[in-house]
Amino acid sequence: FKKLNMCMYIIMGLLLLLAILLMVTSCRSNALEEENEYDVSMMHTVGVSDVIDMFANEGTYVLYIGRETCSVCHDLLPALQEAQIKNNYITQYLDITQVDRSSSDWETLVGLLDVETTTTMDEEGETEEVTNTFGYFLDTKGFTPCVIIISGGEQIAGFFGSRSLTNFEDWLANYGI
């Protein structure tokens, strides 16, 4: 009976340890989900026609094109938010999932995003560098995140992918933001 009691205590101890471990893991998982929340509420949400209007104005705009289901967008978001606060501007946010990519407005916008960029594409294990316009990559590939600076009625700069806060702020400073 002593061996049976000892086994029962060991089994109960292991079960208790397992329960504690599961609770800690669950709490960490919830904390990570909250930490990675896709919160664009401090940005001004715009539609395609609004972006076209930015090209008709003389102002300077930081346009962020992203989507909640993009992990790299989640990575870039804290830098966008912090830079916006530090540099006192409002990011214009276009959610690519809300865009009718068959509309004439979209076709107009794709044409306005005429600055060329080079990106590495990996298709079926083969990588190649492709150079084309931002409009092309957004329209045909749906690449996000994308940050574009519009100033004086034209696209003056842009990038795809994520950047650190320091790198992003340096990039903005190059264009007077």
Residue spans for each PLM region:
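Solvent-exposed loop/turn segments at secondary-structure junctions
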Residues: 68-72, 97-100, 154-156, 163-165
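Core hydrophobic alpha-helical transmembrane segments of single-pass membrane proteins
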Residues: 11-19
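N-terminal leader/targeting and pre-domain segments
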Residues: 3-12, 24-58, 167-177
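Extended, charge-rich low-complexity interaction segments
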Residues: 116-152
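Local sequence-structure signature of Cys/Sec-based thiol-disulfide redox active-site neighborhoods
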Residues: 52-94
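Extracytoplasmic/periplasmic, Sec-exported soluble proteins
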Residues: 43, 68-75, 139, 160
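Thiol-based oxidoreductase modules, predominantly thioredoxin-like and allied folds used
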Residues: 88-128
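Non-catalytic, surface beta->alpha helical segment in thiol-disulfide oxidoreductase systems
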Residues: 138-177
